[in-house]
């Protein structure tokens, strides 16, 4: 709307100043994620090795697609082993540096794949190709997901397994914990169970 009013002003139309307009913030909806069953179905799907590596990297670490594409062989080889996971620093959104932790078997699989090409990066597939392949997979499997859905799925599983929200925030590279709270998905059953705890407490005081 602001852009439209500026356009009108530049064309000589005397409209209301955009600074006088208050636009209420629309709350962000919960992040879309895959269920455990859908994850298993996805991993059983027959796909190109490079696409599988990209999916595994995003799904097992919460990396964005741009972060996965920039990951180099040298980074992996020099990664420090922490609690059975390889710690790698990636340059995320707004050029913020953060740590991601990659499972050993996925590191081995990624390096095995990367040996087949001469690029410095682990993945030798362009961004558009990954997006194109994912669209085909979603069509074949009958449920929608994007590269970012894989990141959402990783973060959702952490939250659902009772990980501290502030730790998940650091792993995700979010600027605030409010953004991370989008992964606090709750079913009607779970909400009812929580509400029942208070009701039980009140009844016990009668």
PLM features: what roles do these ranges have?
Residues 70-109:
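Conserved tyrosine-mediated DNA breakage-rejoining catalytic core shared by Y-recombinases
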Residues 116-121, 131-170, 174:
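Short, basic (Lys/Arg/His-rich) helix/loop patches that form interaction surfaces
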Residues 1-19, 63-66:
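N-terminal DNA-binding recognition helix of tyrosine site-specific recombinases/integrases
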Residues 199-206:
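C-terminal secondary-structure termini that scaffold catalytic or DNA-interacting sites
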Residues 33, 94, 172, 177-197:
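Catalytic-site neighborhood detector that most strongly recognizes the C-terminal catalytic loop/helix
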Residues 16, 89-91, 104-136:
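Major-groove DNA-contacting interfaces characterized by cationic-aromatic clusters
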Residues 10-41, 91, 116:
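Flexible interdomain linker/hinge and immediately adjacent N-terminus
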